């Protein structure tokens, strides 16, 4: 007997592909949350807006180099330039945010950095709103020949689709997965094998002890913000390439889902952030496919509440020991 469409194996595999793609973006965002929390015990709620700024930097590169200014530029080097500009710009933005919004408040009551983070978030959203307007901006309108940013060209910028046993896999989905895996491997090697990685781990374990050992903890913290923001910038560009549109408010919900991924996986744990991102992406895809898009956020944030109640340290996190 043939199962109804909602329970079809083919649909399940398609949703899994979509969920892994989404989860890759959430994992990159979650890594920024978890790295900063691991070192400062600070929740950087402006992180989602750094992701949004990265997406708009990619849009700026595309509109300048992919449109009338250089119409013959090949797509591959153009996409590479978008990634490099967005990652560098987002990384520098993260350093500036740490220096001026968080560093002066390190010894302040814990509520002060949270309020500062919300202020930075609103500042970034409204700055992008003033620069680009409230309408959706589309990545592929320039490449496809339209110079009007209000023209919506549906579909991803990188279009080819492979059909594998009836399941559609877009080339951009493969690119997102490969880039995410590459960045996660690079981050893991950075933290585990390099001097700066050892300094990051020492600072996370005991900041005062690290200072006594001669580690410049201010520089380490700035570098941590830089790396987390670089990953968010890459995720922002991949969102634009995947969904073809960016908007000034896109960082809010993506930031919340990235935070959810970090908490579910175990905030402060790098492998936990990666696992949490995949779980949140898969949950969102399955909920949308089987119950309708309006249920996606309900299920995702319901899981966040459940994890906080049952295992507050997350799946791969460790309980914090209080010193007496």
Language-model regions, residue ranges each:
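Inter-helical junctions in multi-pass inner-membrane proteins, predominant
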Residues: 7-25, 169, 190-195, 221-261, ...
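Helix-loop-helix "hairpin" substructures at the membrane interface of multi-pass membrane proteins
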Residues: 22, 165-246, 270-275
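Transmembrane helix-bundle core of multi-pass membrane transporters
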Residues: 104-105, 113-193, 220, 286, ...
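Single transmembrane alpha-helix segments in multi-pass membrane proteins
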Residues: 12-63, 96-112, 264-270
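Alpha-helical transmembrane segments within multi-pass membrane transporters and channels
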Residues: 69-120, 127, 275-280, 284, ...
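Short loop segments and helix-boundary regions at transmembrane helix junctions
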Residues: 38-46, 92-138, 190-197, 202, ...
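Cytosolic-side transmembrane-helix boundaries in multi-pass membrane proteins
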Residues: 2, 10-11, 131, 205-212, ...
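Membrane-interfacial amphipathic/re-entrant helices at transmembrane-helix boundaries
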Residues: 1-29, 57, 68-82, 108-112, ...
């Amino acid at each position: 007997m043939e199962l109804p469409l909602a329970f079809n194996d083919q649909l399940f595999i398609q949703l899994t592909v979509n969920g892994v793609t989404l989860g890759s973006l959430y994992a990159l965002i979650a890594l920024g949350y978890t790295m900063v929390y691991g070192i400062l015990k600070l929740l950087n709620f402006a992180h989602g807006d750094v992701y949004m700024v990265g997406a708009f930097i990619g849009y700026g590169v595309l509109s300048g180099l992919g449109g009338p200014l250089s119409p013959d530029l090949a797509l591959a080097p153009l996409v590479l330039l978008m990634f490099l500009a967005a990652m560098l710009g987002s990384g520098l933005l993260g350093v500036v945010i740490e220096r001026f919004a968080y560093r002066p408040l390190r010894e302040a009551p814990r509520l002060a950095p949270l309020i500062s983070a919300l202020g930075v978030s609103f500042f970034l959203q409204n700055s992008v709103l003033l620069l680009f307007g409230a309408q959706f901006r589309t990545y592929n309108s320039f490449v496809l020949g339209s110079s009007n940013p209000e023209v919506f060209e549906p579909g991803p910028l990188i279009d080819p689709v492979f059909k594998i046993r009836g399941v559609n896999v877009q080339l951009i989905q493969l690119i997102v997965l490969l880039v995410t895996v590459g960045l996660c491997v690079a981050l893991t090697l950075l933290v585990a094998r390099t001097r700066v990685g050892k300094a990051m781990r020492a600072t996370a374990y005991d900041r005062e002890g690290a200072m006594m050992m001669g580690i410049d903890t201010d520089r380490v913290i700035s570098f941590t913000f830089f790396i987390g923001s670089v990953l968010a910038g890459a995720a922002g560009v991949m969102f634009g390439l995947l969904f073809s549109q960016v908007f000034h408010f896109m960082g809010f919900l993506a930031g919340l889902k990235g935070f959810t991924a970090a908490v579910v996986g175990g905030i402060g744990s790098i492998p936990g952030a990666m696992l949490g991102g995949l779980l949140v992406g898969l949950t969102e895809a399955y909920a949308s496919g089987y119950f309708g898009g309006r249920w996606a956020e309900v299920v995702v944030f319901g899981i966040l509440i459940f994890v906080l109640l049952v295992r507050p340290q997350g799946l791969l996190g460790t309980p914090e020991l209080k010193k007496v």
